Amino acid sequence: MHVQRVVVPGSGAESWTVLDGDGVPVEPLERYLAYLTDVERSPNTVRAYAFDLRDFWVFLAGRGLDWRAVRLEDIGEYVAWLRLPAAGRGGEVAVLPSVAPQVAAATVNRKLSALAAFYCHQARHGADVGGLLSAWRPAGQRGGWKPFLHHVSKGRPAPRRAIAVKTPRPLPRVLGPEQVQAILDACDHLRDRFLLALMWESGCRVGEALGLRHEDIAAAEREIAFVPRVNANNARCKSGQPRTVPVSAGLIRLWGDYLHLEYGQLDSDYVFVNLFAGPRGQALTYPAVYDLIRRLRVKVGFSFGAHWLRHTAATRMLRDGVPIEVVSEILGHGSVAITSAVYGHLTAADARRALEAAGWFTGSEVSW
């Protein structure tokens, strides 16, 4: 089985499907992935779901199981199967117990989330999936859908088992002020400097920056609007809701310098366009940004990613005392809980600053 990129007739939208060994689309996956495309899920999300569900179908085929007759125990075996080396999944090679898992716990949980979403969608549309969903409580399952006759049984306890692999919560990777300055100073062009400065100050995502239009920048008000829309470069606003973010006068001046000294008379709605490679004036793409990051890593001598600038912005705001509700709105999170879960981390230095500000280390009633 393999995953195939497809283009939706008429709209030209990008989607993905899963083909069996004969090159025929796997029907339930084909319909589900088409549904995700129809409801405007990100192409990257649809692609990830396609690969995750492909893996489950390979597992089912290896055990001769029908997807509609899967039991909770089969899901548990699937988790164990995922963590085997590729050579051990077919059963031809014995795997010693001491061999480390080949798939990270976070990846396993992501695949389980995709699988849970698929089964919930099938049940919602009348497919008979047996008693799987009545026994399985996927980790982090959300949504307002409730099964038929839910009102009859909602007061009764219905214990369900969660299947998830324990994962340590990774801390967001952030950059220090000297590192950010080094990155900006290493940029050869104002366009690149403005792009990275925008991400560091506003906390926007790469896709939100690449989809930016000139009309989205209100220079007098020093505000930038990030608006979900279809973009020629496939850039996307992940949040799905427009938001307006205040920015500094310095960032607006940098935008003006970029327009005056590099952008010139180009006729394009997009703020970030090809100027030095590729079709001049065409909207800048994700690969172009990732290539820029790779070149800058070599120049500055340390590793970083584009998303680190967003993490740095959020962490800096919170450390400077910006209320978490404001930070959540600026980042475009769906809820404050998301912001708290991602950025509610403290280093020892953060804790010391908070305790010193509260006078914890001075004026003690007990002497040592």
Whereabouts are the PLM-identified features?
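C-terminal secondary-structure termini that scaffold catalytic or DNA-interacting sites
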Residues: M1-Q4, G278, A358-W368
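N-terminal core-binding DNA-recognition domain of tyrosine recombinases/integrases
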Residues: L29-N44, R54-H150, A182
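Short, charged phosphate-coordinating catalytic segments
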Residues: H125-V129, M199-R222, R280, E325-V326
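Flexible interdomain linker/hinge and immediately adjacent N-terminus
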Residues: D128-Q181, L275-R280
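Basic, Lys/Arg- and aromatic-enriched nucleic-acid-binding interface segment
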Residues: T167-V206, L210, L266
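Conserved tyrosine-mediated DNA breakage-rejoining catalytic core shared by Y-recombinases
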Residues: G207, G211-R253
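Active-site/catalytic core of tyrosine-dependent DNA strand-transfer enzymes
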Residues: S248-G301
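Short, basic (Lys/Arg/His-rich) helix/loop patches that form interaction surfaces
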Residues: Y290-E329, H333-V336, H345, L355
